Amino acid sequence: MELILGSQSSARANLLKEHGIKFEQKALYFDEESLKTTDPREFVYLACKGKLEKAKELLANNCAIVVADSVVSVGNRMQRKAKNKREALEFLKRQNGNEIEVLTCSALISPVLEWLDLSVFRARLKAFDCSEIEKYLESGLWQGSAGCVRLEDFHKPYIKSSSKNLSVGLGLNVEGLLGALKLGVKLSLL
């Protein structure tokens, strides 16, 4: 069965590659600006459901489609993708020395199965080095990442402690997805 990743995220693509999952990457357009909620959990769930509905339009007999959405929450205040450097700096100031939550809603749809999961990755951060913040902002790497969070590089040395489900923090619940894919294969054999 062909697997399609309905996302332009390189982090999600890398997670699938690291787990030996073969896939084709296709962008799905869903207007997240149409969502009016400020609750991080509700937002990420509704965004993922919206992408799942778009994925249903692409669904064919022999394919499965994976979609996901992530937001960052600091003190229950939602951080999406920063629109500019000023907003990116505000996000980083709020995260500095605090606990952050990366909320990721992952979903899979196939002819035999529909799976949806909302998981949270938590990390307690040390204080950021001011000169490193400036370099990070200048690099532009923060663009396109929810809350400007990049656990794979910028944020990595500042993690004091965290939950164990790093793939959720990187934008896709791979462990849950692998279970859903195995279940889908078993169901298709019935």
Swiss-Prot record:
GO annotation, cellular component aspect: cytoplasm
Keyword terms of this UniProt record: Cytoplasm, Hydrolase, Nucleotide metabolism
SUPFAM superfamilies: ITPase-like (SSF52972)
Main localization category: cytoplasm
Gene Ontology molecular-function annotations: nucleoside triphosphate diphosphatase activity
Subcellular location: Cytoplasm
NCBIfam families in the record: maf, PRK04056.1
Name of this chain's protein: Nucleoside triphosphate pyrophosphatase
Taxonomic lineage: Bacteria, Pseudomonadati, Campylobacterota, Epsilonproteobacteria, Campylobacterales
